[in-house]
Amino acid sequence: MERREALKNLGFGSAAIFTSSMLFGALQGCSSQPRVDWIPVSMSPEQAAQLEKICESICPKTTTPGATEAGVANHLDQALSVLREDREVDFFKRGMQVFVDNFNENQEVAFDEATTEQVTDVINSYFKKYDENLEMLEALRSGMGEEGEKSEEFLETYFVTQVVDSTFHSYFTSELVGETVMPYDPIPVKYEGC
């Protein structure tokens, strides 16, 4: 009888442990804080999730892998911490915050709930604005060398141009895209020797 009781108690104990871990995981999954599956180096987890969403809207998944699958946001975060000067990193982060704030003010939906198509439309609208008003890009180039506080328009222009350029560069140089989308065949024809 004691053996039967021990097995019963063991079953109840393991069920309780299993159920509590599932409940904890479910509650943790309900948190409102956006998450990424990599550890950010130069950004907060919230900024990393925002960057990942922006990168995915620039290179969305279609028949080819998207920016998220290629690890573009992770690469950009690491590049910011290693390759950029501190003030450029500051411009990038502050520009991203201005971009997200303007998105929240001017769009019907908040940035965190927006689809990649909605974010893509906003980024495209920025480039249409830059095409119509080249002075904005000229102000960006001339403002980079100047010291002092930068305007929100400067920061946002810096961020949008840098994130699009860096996303495409990181996407096309990633291992996943290099092997699956653009595989290199050194000899495209069949070679028959003498």
Report residues per predicted region.
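C-terminal segment of N-terminal export signals and the immediately downstream linker at the start
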Residues: 1-5, 21-57
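Structural motif
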Residues: 44-48, 67, 154-159
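A short N-terminal beta->alpha junction/helix N-cap motif
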Residues: 38-42, 60-67, 83-87
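Functionally engaged cysteine thiol sites
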Residues: 30, 63, 192-194
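N-terminal secretory signal peptides and thylakoid transit peptides that target proteins
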Residues: 1-17
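Post-signal-peptide N-terminal segment of Sec-exported extracytoplasmic proteins
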Residues: 47-78
